[in-house]
Amino acid sequence: MPLLILAATGPALATGLGAVPVFFMGRRAAAWQPALWGLAAGVMAVASIVGLLQPALDQGSLVAVAGGLAAGTAFLVVTRVALSSTHPHVGQLRGADVRTSILVFGVLFVHSLPEGFAIGTVYASETAGLGLFVILAIALQNIPEGTSVAIPMADAGFSRRQQFWAAVATSAPQPVGAAVAFALVETVSGLLAV
């Protein structure tokens, strides 16, 4: 289990790595924002379609997949509406960039738990080499997520350190999800062996 937690922490650190390019842009981050958002969205969209949507359609019904997509979309719309009617601030920072920072952070934080489930399930299955492949795939996909976190934070005036650790924190659920999934698979496997 300690090796699993360590392995699941790697993709979280990769999310922090995604914040690093934004550090070097300084005031130019705003000019690069459309390109960075586009890059991050493109990578995440392809990862979602190839890594999530296609396997879901292969394993389940179109109705179930459409229901999941609708629920996720509704969650984002409700969250965005709730944030737009408030005036969030962090310290002296206020405005739309703070709102966007909170929304992006929250969505990616929630999104990280199933990634942890994937890591824990693969490690519990003891499939040679697959665990490392899943960790590397999630880590690569997490890099643009870190960029997505850092972009609005840079515009809102957050420090580089805050951008980096906020990006890493969005993936904090991954080790927790990995441990929970690993324990569940081990428990169920033990029950099936009886």
Residue ranges of predicted features:
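Intrinsically disordered, metal-sensing/regulatory segments
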Residues: 1-194
